[in-house]
Amino acid sequence: MFDLRYHVASLAAVFLALAVGILLGVAISGKVGDAEDSFRAAEVERLSDRLQEEQERAVAARQRGEAADELVERTYPVLMEDRLAERRFALVFLGPVSGRARSAVERTLSDAGSGDPVRMVALDVPVDVEELDEALLADEELAAYAEEGDDFSGLGDDLGEELVAGGETPLWSALSSLLVEERAGTSTLEVDGAIVVESWSAPPTEDVDEAERIRATRSLLDGLLRGLDNTGFPVVGVETATSDDSAIDDYHRLGISSVDNVDTIAGRLALALLLAGGQPGNYGVKDSASDGVVPPIESVPPPETGA
């Protein structure tokens, strides 16, 4: 039988072990806490340094941007002067007229010596598939365009080519009441290029009939863009810097050059350079501008003088 002294000694040993454990735990937790505090302090310092670097880069970028804007603004009149002189252009809205885009395009052409667009057409979209089919089938010369059901890409191709060529335009004459919302200018003169503004965007829908109408409209618009491009003249799709719905992906998909900030000085310069035959690409300030702000700038050839 254990005596009292042994029992007391055992209890003392247990309490001593507990005390040592508590002291060690406190020491270790203190060290861990110190380590965590040190880590947090180092992380805060690292993030602070990184933020400072980003802020410095942002300031530098803003300063470069302001300098570039100032340079473009100062050189704009010289770079634009007569760049499009004696050239004629068509302005095409794939949807209703956008006043802001129209004003920017007209300003571009005026600044570059071209004057107002020779003709402007705004399409009435989405198309009414049944009415368009009926109109096509009622004319022997147009009936073939209705053979593909709701695919009007072939019709769009020929409409685009007619729009550039001018002169007699049998397709536009026959279908204007169905396809044209607004027009201005003359249709008789050939143009040297076209500016396109896609001002209509298809709304999301689960309605089968409406989805068919949207597909038919898209096929017509894509065909028209291809038809314009097939002429070999410059075709440029444009939008303003603040456009809610961007059409740049559509232009890019069809191989059409684009400017996404036509309502700015740099955008107007980019448009003029492209219409003058500059390097094709997607220009502007948005993420879609894969080729920079403006195309490479070439000098305007001096006017020819007699001997």
Language-model features: locations:
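Extracytoplasmic/luminal low-complexity segments enriched in Pro/Gly and acidic/polar residues
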Residues: V196, W200-A307
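Long, leucine- and charge-enriched amphipathic alpha-helices
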Residues: G30-L79
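Hydrophobic membrane-insertion alpha-helices, especially the h-region
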Residues: A9-G25
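Signal peptide-directed extracytoplasmic domains
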Residues: V59-R88, L94-L155
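Loop/turn elements at helix/coil->beta-strand transitions in domains of secreted/extracellular proteins
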Residues: G115-D116, E190-A194, T231-P234
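Terminal targeting segments of Actinobacterial cell-envelope proteins
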Residues: M1-Y6
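A substrate-binding/cap region within the structured catalytic cores of diverse enzymes
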Residues: D124-A216, L220-G223
